[in-house]
């Protein structure tokens, strides 16, 4: 039998990082076994489900390169099928109509609280004759859960997990308005979709026990279950926004590459020996649900940064350039950069990529490191650069300006010879002239090599930027060293 997995998100928000990992595990296992992964949108909560959320989920999957087979399946659109199965269970004596009033249910809950017990429905309509049912109550349908013994969930990750049946009670499968509960709809859909393997978070383990009861009541085969550990923050607590609980779209906007995020997520709860960096082909070849760990994984943003930095360094220059341009419209200040990216600056940006990617962990860092290319003149110096262009720094810069202006050829070799010759004649270390020059050219003390920057910007732009600082910075220091 071919393996069929499913990713079944609720469209009440974005595709969060935990959901992305669940989708990845389902996708990898389907690919590993030559099977299929289906997408089911669990949109029965009509008040909270939105089309925007559905789009965000699908966009997130596409961005991560996680394709699904066939069209997305709407759980809401299958409500009639869910109702039919619930009524069939009643006919088969496996479920029953419950006419308990809201007041009765409130009394059951209150009595349980008073006695220190968990609130459980007491089964009062389990064997009662419905001909005596009150006319003013619309019934729900409840499953006839086993009252003795235990329900065992056979799980490929967690092992056999046992649930005393006395703790599960006769839960509702169809509400009084005819709509199915989540517990019931999931079972019917998994059966009808031919799902063979359910891979999801271990917060669904209790649900698995109740769903097992429904599968057994219908006489259906129970899919193989694999409940994967949740992702915790670096502090070991439940993942919060502060520690990484963001949507996939947020990581895209933060400049992470989909290949890097896949590589990072696959190792949260699963591993293949000491292998840390894996191609997608390796992941498909190696992934198996039997190798998933039981313990919660911890989200480490520094580790993600390191992996993303590796993928950036290994990326094709043109692909990286295109990816950087693509996120400009989504990041702060990106639209202003796009307005200034004329043909010349685009060419300069692309030319700088080989150098920039060596010092960037994200696309946003890469764009920021390239900001000297598209910034407006005169450049605004950051605080560290300002400290270098004091009176002494400006004096050095003035002589550098004159030396560069006289440089016969504007290439790395000629520029190197010109500046190093000047440093030697003045008995200066090269760094003492390179840093003021870097500050004038880029507004910062960190950038690609100063000769690379000079060549990238060209003679006119480089000299103009140096002159800008001689004029503006010198005048701000109340000197007359302007050229």
Swiss-Prot record:
GO MF term (any one): zinc ion binding
GO cellular component, one term: cytosol
CDD domains, per database record: GluRS_core (cd00808)
Catalytic activity: tRNA(Glu) + L-glutamate + ATP = L-glutamyl-tRNA(Glu) + AMP + diphosphate
EC number: 6.1.1.17
Motif ('KMSKS' region): 238-242
Subcellular location: Cytoplasm
Swiss-Prot/TrEMBL keywords: Aminoacyl-tRNA synthetase, ATP-binding, Cytoplasm, Ligase, Nucleotide-binding, Protein biosynthesis
Domain of life of the native organism: Bacteria
Transmembrane annotation, as ranges: none
Chain positions recorded as ATP binding sites: 241
One GO-annotated biological process of the protein: glutamyl-tRNA aminoacylation
Positions occupied by motif 'HIGH' region: 9-19
UniProt-listed PANTHER family: GLUTAMATE--TRNA LIGASE, GLUTAMATE--TRNA LIGASE, MITOCHONDRIAL-RELATED
NCBIfam families: gltX_bact
Description of how the protein assembles with itself and partners: Monomer.
Protein task: Catalyzes the attachment of glutamate to tRNA(Glu) in a two-step reaction: glutamate is first activated by ATP to form Glu-AMP and then transferred to the acceptor end of tRNA(Glu).
Family of the protein in this entry: Belongs to the class-I aminoacyl-tRNA synthetase family. Glutamate--tRNA ligase type 1 subfamily.
Protein name: Glutamate--tRNA ligase 1
Organism (species): Bartonella henselae (strain ATCC 49882 / DSM 28221 / CCUG 30454 / Houston 1)
Gene coding for it: gltX1
């Amino acid at each position: 039998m071919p393996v069929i997995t499913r990713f079944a998100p609720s469209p009440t928000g974005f595709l969060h990082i935990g959901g992305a990992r669940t989708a990845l595990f389902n996708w990898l296992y389907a690919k590993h076994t030559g099977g299929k992964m289906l997408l089911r949108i669990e949109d029965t909560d009509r008040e909270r489900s939105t089309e925007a959320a559905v789009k965000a989920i699908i966009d997130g999957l596409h961005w991560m390169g996680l394709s699904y087979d066939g069209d997305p399946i709407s759980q809401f659109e299958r409500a009639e099928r869910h109702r039919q199965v619930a009524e069939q269970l009643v006919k088969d004596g496996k479920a029953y109509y419950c006419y308990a009033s809201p007041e009765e249910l409130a009394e059951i809950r209150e009595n349980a609280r008073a006695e220190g017990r968990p609130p459980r429905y007491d089964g009062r309509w389990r064997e009662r004759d419905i001909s005596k049912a009150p006319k003013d109550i619309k019934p729900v349908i409840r499953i006839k859960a086993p009252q003795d013994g235990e329900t065992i969930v056979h799980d490929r990750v967690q092992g056999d997990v046992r649930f005393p049946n006395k703790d599960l009670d006769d839960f509702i499968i169809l509400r009084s308005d005819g709509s199915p509960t989540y517990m019931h709809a999931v079972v019917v859909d998994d059966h009808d979709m031919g799902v063979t393997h359910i891979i999801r978070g271990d917060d669904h383990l209790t649900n698995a026990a109740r769903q097992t009861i429904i599968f057994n009541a219908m006489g259906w085969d129970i899919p193989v279950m694999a409940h994967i550990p949740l992702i915790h923050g670096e502090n070991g607590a439940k993942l919060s926004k502060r520690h990484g609980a963001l949507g996939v779209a947020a990581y895209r906007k933060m400049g992470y590459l989909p290949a890097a995020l896949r590589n990072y997520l696959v190792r949260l709860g699963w591993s293949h020996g000491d292998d840390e960096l894996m191609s997608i082909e390796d992941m498909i070849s190696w992934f198996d649900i039997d190798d998933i760990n039981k313990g919660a994984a911890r989200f480490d943003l520094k580790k993600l940064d390191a992996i993303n930095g590796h993928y950036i360094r290994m990326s094709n220059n043109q692909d990286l350039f295109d990816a950087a341009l693509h996120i400009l419209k989504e990041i702060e200040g990106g639209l202003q950069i796009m307005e200034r990216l004329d043909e010349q600056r685009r060419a300069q940006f692309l030319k700088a990529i080989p150098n920039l990617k060596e010092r960037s962990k994200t696309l946003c860092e890469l764009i920021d490191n390239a900001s000297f290319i598209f910034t407006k003149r005169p450049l605004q110096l950051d605080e560290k650069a300002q400290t270098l262009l004091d009176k002494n720094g400006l004096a050095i810069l003035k002589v550098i300006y004159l030396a560069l202006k006289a440089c016969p050829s504007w290439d790395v070799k000629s520029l190197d010879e010109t500046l190093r010759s000047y440093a030697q004649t003045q008995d200066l270390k090269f760094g003492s002239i390179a840093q003021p020059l870097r500050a004038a050219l880029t507004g910062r003390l960190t950038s690609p090599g100063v000769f690379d920057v000079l060549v990238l910007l060209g003679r006119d732009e480089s000299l103009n930027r140096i002159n800008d600082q001689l004029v503006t910075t010198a005048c701000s220091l109340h000197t007359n060293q302007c050229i």
